[in-house]
Amino acid sequence: MLLGRSAAELESWAVAQGQKPFRGRQLHDWLYAKGARSLSEITVLPKAWRESLKEDGVEVGRLKEVHRSVAADATTKLLLSTDDGETIETVGIPTDQRLTVCVSSQVGCPMACRFCATGKGGLQRSLRTHEIVDQVLSVREVMDRRPSHIVFMGMGEPLLNSQAVLDAIRCLNDDLGIGQRRITVSTVGVPKTLPQLAELALATLGRAQFTLAVSLHAPNQALREELIPTAHAYPYEALLEDCRHYLAVTGRRVSFEYILLGGLNDAPEHAAELADRVGGFQSHVNLIAYNPIEEEEFQRPTRARIEGFQRVLERRGVAVSLRASRGLDQNAACGQLRRRRQGS
């Protein structure tokens, strides 16, 4: 696949194909600036070379749109098909100032979080670099707007596909011009992966300036294991210690994600316990009101409970914000569209 390769890699590849280096630069322009979907579109390349590449099975690496869902607030969810017939979701979330793309890193997810639609179907496979990059290009194409921010908060556990994720970040940064500080990688926590991520990011990117978001979703180990079955293998304090190590190695503060589930983890005492855990930590807590999924027992908390939880954290000196809910009328929570289409 050509998508995902850097300008230098495309130049070297073109030379190896018997072409001049500038042919690689032309390819780069058509892949990333123009968003070409096939070699036949790249008419600046010699026709004979294009035909030869097709015969050799060389492809651009774009995915096919299977379904599109647009909410009243213009949040746009795409269901994309890979070349082996799997489907993944990506979401474009627009505001006046920015366009955030929520990308998937795997087909399905092995973490089985009880409140997540994606985890219901398990893991099929990890995505390749070009499949991650394509999601951003697809949203740009459909919404006719340049993405400004990227969040790895779609289907899958990014840290179980670290190299492809980091390679995609390099591409998004260098080839699409999206700054690392505008990219967030979210993880529910997998033992040993946080220290590895810090080292791998430095090796792959030369620096680690993207934001790491760790999904806590509970203020203690017992409740976390109830919500996230895999958490039993990763004690709460060990997870926080690995976050401190990541901060020390990269110099980047950690963001903690906390999904508020009505009547389960949204009480003032939960907020106080969470503040005790992360207080004094160079971090930020991002609260997320639960987005209901079909056939699930969890409830979205009331506005009063959400605001009360946030006030407790603020009074304890914890940096906190509440993520705006988007696309509620179109079931924009991760995995819902794919799950619905598979069941139909």
From Swiss-Prot:
Name listed for the protein in its UniProt record: Probable dual-specificity RNA methyltransferase RlmN
Residue pairs linked by disulfide bridges in the UniProt entry: 102-334
GO molecular function: 4 iron, 4 sulfur cluster binding; metal ion binding; rRNA (adenine(2503)-C2-)-methyltransferase activity; rRNA binding; tRNA (adenine(37)-C2)-methyltransferase activity; tRNA binding
InterPro entries tied to this protein: Aldolase_TIM, Methyltransferase_A, RlmN_N, RNA_MTrfase_RlmN, rRNA_lsu_MTrfase_RlmN/Cfr, rSAM
Keyword flag Phosphoprotein: no
Binding residues annotated for S-adenosyl-L-methionine, in chain numbering: 156-157, 186, 215-217, 291
Function statement: Specifically methylates position 2 of adenine 2503 in 23S rRNA and position 2 of adenine 37 in tRNAs.
Species this protein is from: Parasynechococcus marenigrum (strain WH8102)
Compartments in which it is found: Cytoplasm
